[in-house]
Amino acid sequence: MLSLDFNNELIKAAPIVGTGVADVSARLFFGLSLNEWFYVAAIAYTVVQIGAKVVDKMIDWKKANKE
């Protein structure tokens, strides 16, 4: 919920329920917080992309040597 008070120049924002639920459920897996899971996901994504690039280059190298 967002509350704007123009007289006192205040903006009050209550946390979204989904964020709280996501944080609690994230802590159930290995005790990591939500932003730590983002770090894990970013590292895993990077490793997968590097692996995919290596496989792609190996396939290109095999095709070049076959001809």
Swiss-Prot record:
Membrane topology, record value: Single-pass type II membrane protein
Residues that span the membrane, as ranges: 37-55
The organism's taxonomic lineage, starting at the top: Viruses, Duplodnaviria, Heunggongvirae, Uroviricota, Caudoviricetes
Pfam families tied to this protein: Phage_holin_2_2 (PF10746)
Recorded GO CC terms: host cell plasma membrane; membrane
GO biological process terms, semicolon-separated: viral release from host cell by cytolysis
Gene Ontology molecular function: pore-forming activity
InterPro entries from the UniProt entry: Phage_T7_Gp17.5_holin (IPR019682)
Regions of this protein lying in the Cytoplasmic compartment: 1-36
Parts of the chain on the Periplasmic side: 56-67
Keywords assigned: Cytolysis, Host cell inner membrane, Host cell lysis by virus, Host cell membrane, Host membrane, Membrane, Signal-anchor, Transmembrane, Transmembrane helix, Viral release from host cell
Stated role: Accumulates harmlessly in the cytoplasmic membrane until it reaches a critical concentration that triggers the formation of micron-scale pores (holes) causing host cell membrane disruption and endolysin escape into the periplasmic space. Participates in determining the precise timing of host cell lysis. Participates with the endolysin and spanin proteins in the sequential events which lead to the programmed host cell lysis releasing the mature viral particles from the host cell.
UniProt cross-references to HAMAP family, sorted A to Z: HOLIN_T7 (MF_04108)
Annotated localization: Host cell inner membrane
Family: Belongs to the T7likevirus holin family.
Species of the source: Escherichia phage T7 (Bacteriophage T7)
Record protein name field: Holin
